[in-house]
Amino acid sequence: MSSKNVKVAKPYADAFIEIANKGSVINDLNCIATALSESKDLQKAIANPLVSSAAKKDIIKSIFAGNVDENTVKFMMVLCDRGRIEYLDAIAETALILAYKQASIEMAYVASSVKLSSAQTEALVDKLKAMTKADQIKLELKVDESLIGGFKVQIGSRIIDTSVQNQLKQLSSYLGASVA
């Protein structure tokens, strides 16, 4: 997210968290994020200055009405009126982080060299809960074969890197060689 997007998104994300239905806020934000990530046409339509605000409202109502809380739809209408709907992705991402924080949910991004089994995933979640004292851990898993073996975890500002790739880098640094 660019610094301009962050500057624009933060106040709107704060406002959304204030007015949102507390029971559905995380589901609503996940629904918005999923719709935006899966539809490049939707992203283009709401970011296009040639598409009128009324047309953008119609698009949003047709996609989200009935799928998210009424206050969430109204909030997106306000974004259209203010000419800020193009920042919906950044606003949703920022608001989701705030909602997770309020619900004592930590987001952890995990890259592993192979797909983790359910037992490994559960063990990792338990360790991360103990480490962060969070009530819940939400994992975003991806496979990165360049790690050779092991995994990397980013949770908040902390990074845990147990990958073979990292160990080789450390070893080469110790030996004075360079590894590409």
UniProtKB/Swiss-Prot annotation:
Q: Quote the subcellular location field of this record.
A: Plastid, Chloroplast thylakoid membrane
Q: Does the keyword Acyltransferase apply?
A: no
**UniProt keyword Membrane, yes or no:** yes
Specify the domain of life of the species encoding this protein.
Eukaryota
UniProt gene name: atpD
Q: What keywords are annotated for this sequence in UniProt?
A: ATP synthesis, CF(1), Chloroplast, Hydrogen ion transport, Ion transport, Membrane, Plastid, Thylakoid, Transport
Q: Check the record and name the PANTHER family matching this protein.
A: ATP SYNTHASE DELTA CHAIN
Question: GO CC terms on record?
Answer: chloroplast thylakoid membrane; proton-transporting ATP synthase complex
Q: Which Pfam families does this entry report, sorted A to Z?
A: OSCP (PF00213)
Q: What is this protein called?
A: ATP synthase subunit delta, chloroplastic
Q: What does this protein do?
A: F(1)F(0) ATP synthase produces ATP from ADP in the presence of a proton or sodium gradient. F-type ATPases consist of two structural domains, F(1) containing the extramembraneous catalytic core and F(0) containing the membrane proton channel, linked together by a central stalk and a peripheral stalk. During catalysis, ATP synthesis in the catalytic domain of F(1) is coupled via a rotary mechanism of the central stalk subunits to proton translocation.
User: How does it sit in the bilayer?
Assistant: Peripheral membrane protein
